[in-house]
Amino acid sequence: MVKISVIMPVYNGEKYLEKTCLNLSKQTLTDIELICVNDGSTDNSLNILEKLADKYDFIKIINQENQGSGVARNNGIENAIGEYIAFLDADDIYVDVDALEKMYEYGSKHDADMVGANQKRVSIDGNLEDNFNYKQKNYTYFSDYGVISPQEYGIPWAFYKNIFKRSFLNKHNITFPNLKRGQDPVFLAEVLTKVNQIYVVCTDLYGYNYALGGGANSKVNDYNKKLDYMNHYKMTFKILDDAHFTEISNSYKKQLITYLKLKNNRNDKELFEIVHKIFEDDNKTYFENVDEEIIYLELCLVNPENKDVYTFLIESVKSQLYSMNINNIQINPVIFKKYLEVLSATNYSPSTNPEMCQLRDEIENSNSWKCTLPIRLTKNMTIKVLKKIKNKVL
């Protein structure tokens, strides 16, 4: 019986395959299979895999046209026969030699749908380093055997440091979306919102080769990748919000804002046009000023159910608006109108803040605000008329 099927998408990984397969062969759990999904590699990866399959009897090779790692992982899951599913990228490693065995035994004992472990970073010279995500509390470090709720996991990152019961994934039809970038958090968000509890083990399963994988910026480097990466945020937010995973969702929204404020991203007009297209359905005007785009996005992402993140976003917007005002930078009335709408919807009175009250008065007395008054009045009147018609029909 195959206890764990390890899924490994392979695209032009000829430099790493021998080392990665050797690393996996050292795991103390021997009842495993490694499903290598060759994703249309154009280098010597397939030939190397075939030689490795002769050497290691646990290797199975699947070939597909180049469709991306998400589709490759789905293909691997469909062809897996193991009780549990694990994931491994061609340039990464498993750290503790008994990690899979510990996780399988604990998961099997408790009939767990998901078993979590810990992760290390692999430096450019191959040394293991601590994972900074634990210090930043992006997700939880497991210091002992135990059980946690899915809400305690943290933001849906590092899916590969966990194993998942295959029958659970099939039952809930959980797969990777067909995105060029960002498919991993969508997959893990689906898991977290479907699983009842997570069994955790104090072991280092995964070694992520950060030097080779790079950060998001190095991977999101053309229009389609940027589009998919921003879409993954929207998809993940919806999954989490629909399941009332408010705290995790809002924490991930903060990650998006932080990402967009990075120096390299602030100067990427193409990226912000994509952000505007995906997130700002109620605003047809693209703001040429990056700060205005970020402010409007923050207002679109506000969710009052989580007080901490709501306060974070509102205070961020408020301080940016006030800073623009005292520096004599004209504030777009569309942004301030959205700000007042958010405050009104959350029963927060802007009049309790003298500075913002003054700013509101200045904007409402400005020429740009007065010039757009007929448009706003017409829009409001149209909405009222439509509501009356709807009520009569009902």
Predicted regions and their residues:
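Short aromatic/hydrophobic "clamp" motif used to bind/position activated sugar donors
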Residues: 85
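Boundary detector for helix-to-coil junctions that initiate low-complexity/charged tails
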Residues: 315-394
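A conserved acidic beta->alpha catalytic loop
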Residues: 38-47
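Cell-envelope/extracellular polymer assembly enzymes that use nucleotide-activated donors
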Residues: 2-5, 33, 186
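Short, well-formed alpha-helical segments that are part of the catalytic scaffolds
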Residues: 12-26
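Donor-binding/catalytic cores of nucleotide-activated saccharide
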Residues: 69, 90-201, 206-224, 265-266, ...
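Glycine-rich, basic loop-to-helix element that forms the pyrophosphate-binding segment
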Residues: 64-80, 90
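Conserved short acidic donor-positioning loop in nucleotide-sugar-dependent glycosyltransferases
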Residues: 24, 39-40, 67, 90
